[in-house]
């Protein structure tokens, strides 16, 4: 079982579950907790191999990592805590996991907030994955993470996100990195399915105006999917919740509150 923390709000029956990306941990949401727990019950979790769901715990996972099995780790926590339905907030690869949960367990997902969402890999990102695949067993994994961080978050105003990304990634083990990296083999057909199949779940995509790797595909997606909305954050890169926390918190909480009216 993965590590998780709960912040209860006795004045609310609504739950919000936060899902971080690859190489991160629940600590990336530190700028969200204070505001969100004023309005909702909050569930924070560390994906397998990340944060306090460390290597010793993940030794229990003998089988190959898949998006389905990792998504089921999250669903297991909701079932243990008897959370029948939750809003989900994710960033980067965490948005893929949330979308996977919505596909398999639509009745458990009240809404989706997708920060720095990955729904299609452009030519540059596909090349980056292929290059990393070649070097992953040759060089220390942290080198690959640093290259990813620089390419995905290249500008000066992305520095905080970039350094946080690298800091969190250093806590991973090399073997754990390789397990997660193998997920890239199933990512393209999965994302294609997500783009083709629209769910009726209210979805807000929150994308940085400078997220040149992933923004354009989300613009196309939100024009085609009626249940989806796009919010573009000015002067912001990939990790929107870290770079522009006030903007992110105000707009996402407003979105969630609007659903209950």
Where do the model's predicted regions map?
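Conserved alpha/beta-hydrolase "acid-adjacent" motif
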Residues: 212-218
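Active-site loop/oxyanion-hole signature of alpha/beta-hydrolase fold enzymes
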Residues: 34, 43-89, 250
């Amino acid at each position: 079982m993965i590590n998780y923390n709960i912040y209860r709000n006795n004045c609310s029956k609504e739950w919000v579950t936060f899902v971080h990306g690859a190489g991160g941990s629940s600590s990336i949401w530190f700028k969200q907790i204070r505001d969100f727990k004023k309005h909702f019950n909050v569930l924070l979790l560390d994906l397998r191999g990340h944060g306090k769901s460390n290597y010793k715990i993940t030794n229990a996972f003998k089988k190959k990592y898949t998006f389905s099995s990792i998504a089921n780790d999250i669903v297991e926590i909701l079932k243990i805590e008897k959370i029948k339905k939750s809003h989900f907030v994710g960033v980067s690869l965490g948005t893929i996991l949330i979308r996977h949960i919505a596909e398999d367990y639509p009745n458990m997902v009240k809404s989706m907030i997708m920060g720095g969402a990955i729904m299609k890999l452009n030519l540059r990102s596909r090349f980056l994955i292929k290059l990393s695949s070649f070097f992953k067993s040759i060089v220390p994994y942290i080198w690959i993470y640093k290259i990813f961080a620089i390419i995905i978050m290249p500008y000066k105003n992305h520095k905080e996100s970039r350094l946080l990304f690298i800091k969190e990634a250093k806590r991973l083990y090399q073997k754990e990195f390789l397990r997660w990296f193998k997920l890239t083999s199933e990512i393209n057909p999965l994302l294609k399915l997500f783009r083709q199949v629209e769910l009726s779940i209210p979805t807000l995509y929150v994308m940085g105006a400078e997220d040149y790797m992933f923004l354009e595909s989300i613009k196309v997606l939100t024009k085609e999917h009626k249940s989806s909305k796009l919010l573009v954050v000015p002067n912001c890169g990939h990790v929107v919740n870290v770079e522009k926390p006030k903007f992110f918190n105000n707009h996402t909480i407003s979105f969630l509150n609007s659903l209950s009216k």
